[in-house]
Amino acid sequence: MTDFDGIIIGGGHNGLTTAAYLTRAGQKIAVLEATPQIGGGTSTEEPTLPGHKFNLHANFFMGFGHAPLMRDLELHRYGYSYIEPPVQQAGAFRDGSCVVIHQDLDKTCASLAKFSKRDADTFRDLYHRYVVEMRPLLVSLMYNAPLPLDQLTDRLSGPKAKEFLAHSKHDLFSVVADYFDDDRIRTLFTSYMHVITTENVPGSGMVFPGIFANVTGFTLPIGGAVAYPLACARIVAEGGGVVRTNAKVREITIESGRATGVILDNGTELTAGKFVASGIDTPTTVEMAGRELFETEAVEKLDNWHWGNHSLVTLHLALRDAPVYKARDFDPDIDEAFNIFFGMDDLDQVRSCFIDCEEKRFPDVLMGNGSCNSAFDPAYAPADGHSAFWWPFAPYTVDGDPANWDEQKKDYTSRILNVWRDYASNLDDDNVKAEFLYTPLDIERHTPNMINGAVRMGAYIPNQLGVNRPHPSLAGTRTPVEGLYICGSGVGNGGGMNGAPGYIAANAIVDDLRLKRDWTPVAAPEWRD
């Protein structure tokens, strides 16, 4: 007799998504998390002062309003909900100007038109195309196993589909430059395109439609990002399963070519009657199961997995008052914006930042985005305060050694805060009650499978995206090992807070085991115009 129907390795949001769906399919599930708390990239902590909550990783749940997860899992019943602030994004510049992106399309276009009427018209066209008209296609692409380009091309036809596919021939910078004219608008949208830490390399333009589709789809989890994994854990518990922390898996047991369970670091063996699914990084998963069980080409690629040229360094501030941005004189709505970009005033500065990251230097130009979550949900801070953060791009190895993040943390904190003060007028010592710098090295410590501070568990470059993430034999979450699945961010459509790998793996397991499901899978991608 086995201990569980299925075992999930890793208690991050993808592993728990798979667990919640399989629980709803009638399975008894065990989720095993190596660290003291579940959540992985969806964690919420109080690193500054009591009552000031910060999402250490995922904060902007992009496109979550269109994801099947809320509906299928009835997450509202288990404590998860979110808000969509009406003023979604903004870009502030040192000259005091700003661009503001609203959920109201006309207001957004009015903001853009202050710089370029043509760019405002272009934005309106792109909005109708990707945010509205092609949204169903983009959702289906996200929540189905990725297809090889030839198969995808067969399923998409017409002028709009042709334009959609043509993005994959270009890099992100050139795609943005082709669409927009004004330098500040180009600078903002180039920065926005890197919000998922995509590398600017040939072929990276393929992500443009999907990212643009979420330009007004940023959601904030009420009470903290950890509310999502906690909701999934409640579903698992309700179905008779367990979620264990401090349960590090050492080995995936294989018998007669089939995954049958796991062995923990302490020697405890747990058995699974039907499947094992891994939500941690793919290279480690392959090692735990046995390299010889996988295609040689896939193993070689994972041996040389590119974790990324840049990570993020986050300054968390416990404040008395929310930041007031100097650009409010240009457009007062900037103080209402959920996601604010600043630090970059032109494209040369954007390029400079990423060159410094690639060459492993602390950037001369600090640029990134952030938020004051407590301005939208009071649960993020005490009644007499606010919680704000800013996460500039930065390399994992800085000035020759990752340890420099620890040794020079005070200096880096001061430099980052001083840049923030260039844009916000009230971040003086009287307003800042406490500060906490969360570095790329801290990311790896907190979530060990984010190796080298890789917040996406692998760089977003063309040969590590879609069917190539990580390899065609693994991208769809199934593996060559019977009963073993990979449901983490290192496969298929993974790398952001979308639950897609977990969802895709759950559907694959249900299909393979011929289980009954109480949800309707997202339809396969198809487009004809």
Model-inferred region functions:
Residues 254, 512-529:
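Active-site-proximal substrate-binding core of FAD-dependent oxidoreductases
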Residues 116, 322-323, 358-363, 381, ...:
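Flavin-binding catalytic cores
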Residues 94-202:
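Rossmann-like flavin
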Residues 220, 250-381:
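Mid-domain catalytic core of redox enzymes
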Residues 209-263:
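Helical element adjacent to the flavin cofactor pocket in flavoenzyme catalytic cores
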Residues 2-136, 504:
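N-terminal glycine-rich phosphate/pyrophosphate-binding loop and immediately adjacent elements
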Residues 182-196, 362-371, 426-492:
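A glycine-rich dinucleotide-binding beta-alpha-beta segment and adjacent secondary-structure elements
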Residues 489-510:
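A conserved FAD-binding loop/helix module that cradles the flavin
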